[in-house]
Amino acid sequence: MKQYNPKEIESKWQNIWEERGVFHASNDKDKEKFYALIEFPYPSGQGLHVGHPRPYTALDVVSRKRRLEGYNVLYPMGWDAFGLPTENYAIKNKIHPKVVTEQNVARFKKQLQGLGMSFDWSREINTTDPEYYKWTQWIFLKLFEKGLAYKKEMSINWCTSCKVGLANEEVVNGGCERCGAEVVRKQKNQWMLKITEYAERLINDLDLVDYIERVKIQQKNWIGKSEGMEVDFEITGGKKITVYTTRPDTLFGSTYMVISPEHPYIEELAAHIQNMDDLVHYREEAAKKSEFERTELVKDKTGVKIEGIEATNPATGKQIPIFISDYVMMSYGTGAIMAVPGHDTRDWEFAKKFNLPIVEVVSGGNVDEAAYTDTEEGIIVNSDFINGMQVKEAKEKISSWLEEKGLGKRKVNYKLRDWVFSRQRYWGEPIPLVHCDCCGWVPVPESQLPVLLPEVESYEPTDNGESPLANLRDWVETTCPKCGGKAERETDTMPQWAGSSWYFLRYTDPHNNEELASKENLDYWMPIDWYNGGMEHTTLHLLYSRFWHKFLYDCGVVPSCEPYQKRTSHGMILGENNEKMSKSRGNVINPDDIVTEFGADTLRLYEMFIGDFEKSVPWSQNGVKGCRRFLDRIWKLQEILVDSQEMTKELEGNIHKTIKKVTEDYETLKFNTAVASMMALINDFYDHGTVTKGDMKTLLTLLNPVAPHITEELWEVLGFEGHIYGTTWPIWDEAKTIDSVVEIPIQINGKVKGQMVISVDFTADQVKEQFRNDERLMALVEGKSIVKEIYVPGKIYNIVVK
């Protein structure tokens, strides 16, 4: 028997699979399809780390199993290669982003191929390929044509390091999601996408899909639907300020108003305002703060009272003061709030600081001491005609009253904001629009797509916030497609999220030059049957791609309103000390090192055996070694092989149980228990002393999705017909998974004293008879009289003695 040599057999089988196109999906519409998808990676300079193979292997296991079950499986791979990380790396190391991308993709691909993933490499895509981003640009033009892409002067999140505008979703704890640098507010003309137009459908259609519950909850919370009232407050100067509130029942408790420092009424009412200089100074200070700093709950409350104008509370008719404060943002609601300090902590703290009245309107607390916020239920007080009502009844009553008086209207609001789509950087898809003084913004004709990203020597971001492309006058200056006059190209580029918002569609028809993908292929392959990805992308990529897909559905391009039928997520792999892997901690594990020392099958097996797939788990080098020993034991089963195509009779029940367990566990992401059941079966084979060819074929087929190289090699070495990739998945016999005997505990006066093996069919009388016929067991009650006996079928035999 040859020694197990992973290096030799793994490269051999990887070459065979690729040369024969074993994992190439066909467009044979007569076969039932299975489209498995993992998030395509950003190819970083560091290459793969051991966290990458975990989700890749998981869906590889499912894909390999589904192929053996007869499905036409599409399991593709590509590269999300545009974006800030590549550009920042290129600037730092003085290498062009295009060169960086090519080098990184080549390294990533080599690493992935070395892991034996069953990707269909014939469908490989790259978001930086002009033949790919041609269709990203095409989708943008469709959004523009439908009025869902618009340019607007607005206050945006600005990363001080990347020098680029960020969407709200890209700001984490006041810092840039990519680099961690401070994020400030800056006025900028930006392209926006109206994702808010799809807010309701993005919530409702979650009922149509099989996502893990916490993903659905995160998406709903991010969209932030609320139902309330828009209420008009008359103010000095004959104007009205409209506020949005979900608690109109607390209107009688509104003792002051707060508006955003950027509110346009400040300029419009300047003639009435007596302390304009104070307001302008406060606004300048607020502009220096990020949105995170401004809205942080624990920060000190600051503000300035607007002298010279007041508002009228429409419920009480009383005059109330108006303040500006940085915790109110123009980008949320109407840029104004009615403050109810009795029942809102932030309003209460503000009222205390500025010595403003605090009125209790929902009974239950002591508003002199703190805001009473447990007000979802309760009795209304100090509120005139809604006094004594429950909160729910009071909401309805005052809402109707406001509508009747023309003082307000019911409104559904969303926390979700439109998507900031411009990036003032080089390494991204050019936005296919030109600006003409006569015609405004004009789309580049589809026949001229793609608008190629020009080759440049200097791609550093500019200090004035313009894209590096703005300096390329030969490229910028062009002709208006509409009137033939002078025009200039848009110099902002798209965000990294653009290419990843539709990539899964291109996999269905990656070489199509005439359309995004053929209707025939989209109708066959979509929607995706199973998509696995990180929880960190729930409010970014997952939301954006669902939005684009719904838009394309409305355009008649795709056949389904949702792109992903099922979405699962995986836990991180941590360092051995339970800390997140990072270069600074020196605990990063390179998968190449594991493959070199132990083999790809060992790495794959370990990552599936390491623990609950959905939870984060620490790396263990000893665990890796244990998995290698397990594969060695499988290899050595050759030594006890006997020439029989039947299953070992004595182990037949265990084999059928293992088939059932592995089949079900692979589909429910319980890879660790599936592997454990195969380990137990191998122990049975060694304990028995022989393994038949029938046993071996079953074991190798079950293990193949996890450890494909060693199983294919053993299949060939043992002279079995064909290859595992051409065989069929084993089917268990349910009758053979049921034990004919069971071991039950014997409990005497409440304490377990022994065990007995009985037939599963035994009645209580038969159990009693077997107990009395066993001298060893009868010794447990010797000298005592049996008072009572209770048999719980298949579970326990209780005896009471005295």
Swiss-Prot record:
GO CC annotations on file: cytosol
Family in the record: Belongs to the class-I aminoacyl-tRNA synthetase family.
Catalytic activity: tRNA(Leu) + L-leucine + ATP = L-leucyl-tRNA(Leu) + AMP + diphosphate
Protein name: Leucine--tRNA ligase
Pfam families xref list: Anticodon_1, tRNA-synt_1, tRNA-synt_1_2, tRNA-synt_1g
Main location (coarse class): cytoplasm
UniProt motif ('HIGH' region) ranges: 41-52
Keyword field contains Plastid: no
NCBIfam families xrefs: leuS_bact
A Gene Ontology biological process term: leucyl-tRNA aminoacylation
Top-rank taxon: Bacteria
